[in-house]
């Protein structure tokens, strides 16, 4: 097999480090570039271990060549595969850059589809770039999807608030919310799991990736995260993708597709957990609010939702606001953007709406804190 080159954008984050682990166990995949934020020690370890020649990062390393942008990194390396694992709106920009230089995007940055799905798909088609999802749920649907479809189910864990009394949720601390029951993930996505904002984003991502109307995408809680996705076909067949929760498995598949080259834990029958529980509106109001704005068709509102959530979660993690304030900040910001009736016709419009939404969020936060 011919060697394939890989760049990881967001190499020192949760998905990034697991991607590094996967590449170390696969043959014929060469890591040729990374981007990272400020984690110098981990970045240096990766660069030295894989003899990476080029990187983009927030700090200088003692080895390798530092370039001043993700675009420059990708232009120099022109990788076969780019793993897009930068969270938030910065990840959207990185995905757009990757579409110019790579042959396949292993997409973990769900915000790319939430904020710019239409434009990402157009660029991918124009540049003949393959998009393979990394999220466990979308990887699951990707693997079992076929045209004669009635609807799909993606699952949620319910996060740290799943079994708590409703009156205890609003006052939760970051330490309590970051105790995810089944997955080991980064800070923002773990908080987004507790609010189920993450699952709202995944519904939008499924809508964009598989061209499915929202009414054909259902969400249920599977407490152990054993079931990742289900496809219901029109002839009555139900296809289920399941397995122990381990992000390295979908990461590996996004690299090796259509073949399977990665070896992992194989679950036994007595470990199967097929419980599917409804999502409670009172417990996860932001999830349902997100679905409402998505179904209304407004891309500006989706962008505003992401911008507000990104900032609100950071404030929560820094202990500047209570957990219960996240919902108020996001809904208020989206409603303010909604009043402006903004039409998003280009990527430039996407960036402008994000900038506007962040300004509005800061104003909403000021009112919440003072």
From Swiss-Prot:
Which reaction is catalysed here? 2-C-methyl-D-erythritol 4-phosphate + NADP(+) = 1-deoxy-D-xylulose 5-phosphate + NADPH + H(+)
Identify the residues that bind 1-deoxy-D-xylulose 5-phosphate.
110, 136-137, 157, 180, 193, 198-199, 202
> Which positions bind NADPH?
12-15, 37-39, 111, 186
Q: Which pathway features in its UniProt record?
A: Isoprenoid biosynthesis; isopentenyl diphosphate biosynthesis via DXP pathway; isopentenyl diphosphate from 1-deoxy-D-xylulose 5-phosphate: step 1/6
One GO process term, biological-process aspect: isopentenyl diphosphate biosynthetic process, methylerythritol 4-phosphate pathway involved in terpenoid biosynthetic process
Class of this enzyme? oxidoreductase
Q: Which residues bind Mn(2+)?
A: 135, 137, 202
Q: Which GO terms describe its molecular function?
A: 1-deoxy-D-xylulose-5-phosphate reductoisomerase activity; manganese ion binding; NADPH binding
Q: What is its EC number?
A: 1.1.1.267
Q: Write out the similarity annotation.
A: Belongs to the DXR family.
- Physiological role: Catalyzes the NADPH-dependent rearrangement and reduction of 1-deoxy-D-xylulose-5-phosphate (DXP) to 2-C-methyl-D-erythritol 4-phosphate (MEP).
What protein does this entry describe? 1-deoxy-D-xylulose 5-phosphate reductoisomerase
* Native source species: Fervidobacterium nodosum (strain ATCC 35602 / DSM 5306 / Rt17-B1)
> What lineage is this protein's organism placed in?
Bacteria, Thermotogati, Thermotogota, Thermotogae, Thermotogales
